[in-house]
Amino acid sequence: AYNATPGATDAALFLGMINSFSHNTKVTAGIELAVQRNYPKGSILNPDNEYTSNANPWAQTVTLNNIGFGAVSRAMFCFGYLEEAFCIDGNWGAWQGQGTAKDGTAYGFTNFEWLGGSARGAWCFKDGEPLAWAAWSQMATIGDAEEFESTVPPMFYLGRKLLPGYFGSGKYRGGPGESAVHWCVEPGKHIGITRPNGGLSSTASVALGMNGAYPGPSSFMISARGTNLDEVNKKGLAPRDARELLEMTDSGELKVDDLQVWKMDCPELSMKNNDLFVDAAGSSGGWGDPLDRDPNAVIEDLNSGVSYFTNTSRGT
């Protein structure tokens, strides 16, 4: 549910304020004194129905808060506090669902690794960092793949890595987002997967590129059902991220009966043996005009694999 009580909304706002422009790890009375809030009665942040579910206020408040935090970051820049000025993004992701094991045991699950940490947007003087920041947590961590595998019995990681080119370009680029490929193995009687997401389910990701830079790309996921993964695995060529999966599909190396790229919350997807589910999130925006980027930084990104080479030409 995307409703929230005023108290829960305050909690989401205050946590984000700490990470965005405050030098502390705890909420203090200073925030209460410094910030004015207005939650109109009957709005989703102050429902007039006392029985309204309000279990997930972060989903929509992240996007709303980022607008405010971005404005504060611009103000820091204008006042000359350059070390405090960066592009504030909250492009989180997660996936959830339910299943029934072979013996009839029912279970539910959530994989929230891309909620634990996302990329920090570009600073006004340097590139952003991957996985190092989250507006809603003072200790960003995406957790261990093995732990998430233990909570979703049929789904195993084929890859979990930063996605090349998955950031907002600028004089200083944003930190790259991340992608994981999940392999369905002997799912029992049933497993269904859906996807809640801050950039898909409630609102679009806020375009937060600063001073002429591009914003970070929004989250997305891919479902590949009915594959020849057994043959691909024998060659040791299983896809490790979203880009590799699409490239292998285009080349015919990976055969897929039903391939879907989801840029919105997907309906429940029933997964079978050797089906693949790919998610990508956590990208961030850049700072400054991309044409002003140091050519040596462009070369370094290409050599390190943070960016990828695209051979294009444009006529006039």
Feature locations, PLM:
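Glycine/proline-enriched, intrinsically flexible loops and inter-domain linkers
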Residues: 1-316
